[in-house]
Amino acid sequence: GEIRDIETAEIAVQASLTGHLVLSALHTNTAIGAVTRLQDMGVEPFLLSSSLLGVMAQRLIRLLCMDCREAYAPSSLECELLNLTDTSDPVLYRAVGCSSCNETGYRGRTGIYELIEIDETLREMIHDGASEQAMLAQARKNYQGIDADGRRRIIAGETCIEEVLR
């Protein structure tokens, strides 16, 4: 289930500390934001640092309709946004609309994900009450954010920039 209050959070932490694998949901914008949310609920940092193995963020995006997506040469701003500087002639795709997709330009959905394993460094940072920004900077040394997964889907032609940014 979802962790919405301190009582549920404490039950989840206690279950984790006694050897149970606990999977739960929290509403946050980033994976590391789950740590901050649990702290804000009142979970003690020393308990949190001992009980977390990893945190994950996910978001649904629409997939471009493969029957009508339109290839185009991205602008310099789009190339910069996607870090496509090493590609000579990059191609991206945009939604158009056809009878197959009810004129929306999209057919289906998929998830984009971010997974952060709580390593010893992050565990110490959580225990010491480090800021979300500091923990995020540390996590980015080893793990890519949800935006990197979105970028991969854009470059593969599965979705468009607008969909990942919305």
Q: Which residue stretches match the model-derived regions?
A:
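Short, flexible helix-loop junctions that flank or precede catalytic/ligand sites
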Residues: 1-166
